[in-house]
Design a protein with these regions (language model features):
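Short glycine/threonine-rich loop-to-helix capping motif typified by GTGT followed
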Residues: 150-155, 185-196, 223-236, 263-273
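Glycine-rich and small/hydrophobic secondary-structure elements
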Residues: 160-167, 231-250, 274-281
Length: 285
C-alpha cells in the first residue's frame, strides 16, 4: 500500500487551511475571499445559492493554487457547468483545478426529512462533468457531529453513508469521494477517529472488491464545543480540536472563529483562526 493509504497519513505533506463564507452578495464574497487569500488561506469554502454569480465571486482568484469548495442546495450540475465556463473564460486547465462540489442527497434527507431522488441523478451527471481533481461524491458526516453524535457514532453513520453510495454507484466516481467530519476537543479521540475512518474505508473497499484509493477527509472544529458566555476560551477549545485533526491525518481543516457560536461574522476572529493554522504549521516544521 502507498503511504497515504495508511492511517495517519494525508495525501499531501501539509493540510489545506480552509475558511468559509455564506454568499449573500457576490461582490462582498469576492472581497472577503481576496482578503482571506492575502492572509494565507489555502482553501475557500462557499455556501452558494445562485450559480449565476459564480464568476463574480471568483474574480481575480487563481484556482490553480487553492482548494475551492462549493456547498450547493440547488442543482449541482448547473453549478459545475458554471464553474467550467468560468475556467474556460479564464483559460484555466481543468486538470489543475482542485476542490469539491458538495451536494449530498443523504445528508439533505437527514437534515430536511425529504428524500429527493433527482439529487442522485445529479451525482451521475457530475461524474460526467467534473474535472479529475474535483471531488463530487461528498459525505457530510459532520452533520451527525453537529447533532451531538459521539466519535464512534459519527464513524458508524459515515460508513453507512459511504456504503449507500458505493452500493448505488460502484466504481463510478471512486476517486472522487470526500468526507467531512467534525472535530471535538478530546484530541486523542479525534486522532483515533480519523485514523480509524481510513481503516474502515479500506475495509469497505476490500469488501466490495474495489481498488484501494485515497479518501479525502475534511475536518472542521465543532461549534457545539464552543462557549457563548466566555468566547475567548474558544480559541483553546479550537486548538485542541485542530491538533487532533491535524495529527490524525486530515487532508483539510477549518478552524472555526471563536465567535462562530454567536453567529457573528468577525474579521478579527477569522484572522486569529487562520493564525492558529500557522502556529501548528510552524511548530510541526
Amino acid at each position: 500500500q502507498a503511504p497515504d493509504q495508511q492511517p495517519g497519513f494525508r495525501s499531501n505533506p501539509w493540510w489545506v487551511m480552509v475558511q468559509e463564507h455564506a454568499v449573500e452578495k457576490e461582490f462582498e464574497a469576492n472581497d472577503w475571499a481576496l482578503e482571506r487569500l492575502k492572509h494565507g488561506a489555502s482553501g475557500l469554502l462557499f455556501y452558494l445559492y445562485d450559480h449565476q454569480y459564480l464568476p463574480r465571486i471568483l474574480r481575480d482568484i487563481d484556482l490553480r493554487y487553492i482548494q475551492l469548495g462549493l456547498v450547493v442546495e440547488g442543482s449541482g450540475p448547473e453549478v459545475m457547468d458554471a464553474l467550467l465556463h468560468h475556467a474556460h473564460n479564464e483559460i484555466l486547465p481543468l486538470d489543475q483545478m482542485n476542490g469539491f462540489l458538495n451536494t449530498d442527497p443523504v445528508e439533505i434527507a437527514a437534515r430536511t426529512g425529504h428524500w429527493d431522488e433527482s439529487k442522485m441523478y445529479d451525482l451521475g451527471e457530475l461524474s460526467r462533468l467534473a474535472p479529475p481533481k474535483f471531488k463530487y461524491m461528498c459525505v457530510n458526516a459532520n452533520f451527525y457531529g453537529a447533532c451531538g453524535a459521539s466519535a464512534s457514532t459519527q464513524l458508524g453513520l459515515a460508513l453507512a453513508h459511504i456504503d449507500f453510495y458505493l452500493e448505488a454507484f460502484g466504481e463510478v466516481g471512486l476517486e472522487q469521494y470526500w468526507l467531512a467530519l467534525s472535530a471535538g476537543t478530546h484530541m486523542f479521540e479525534e486522532m483515533a477517529k480519523i485514523r480509524a475512518m481510513r481503516l474502515l474505508w479500506g475495509r469497505l473497499l476490500e469488501t466490495y472488491g474495489l481498488p484501494q484509493v485515497h479518501l479525502e477527509i475534511y475536518t472542521e472544529t465543532s461549534i457545539q464545543h464552543q462557549s457563548a458566555l466566555d468566547v475567548e476560551t474558544n480559541l483553546l477549545r479550537a486548538a485542541s480540536a485542530a491538533f487532533g485533526a491535524i495529527t490524525g491525518g486530515a487532508d483539510a481543516l477549518q478552524i472555526r472563529p471563536y465567535t462562530a457560536v454567536l453567529g457573528a461574522n468577525d474579521a478579527e476572529a477569522e484572522r486569529l483562526a487562520l493564525n492558529q493554522h500557522y502556529l501548528f504549521a510552524y511548530e510541526s516544521f
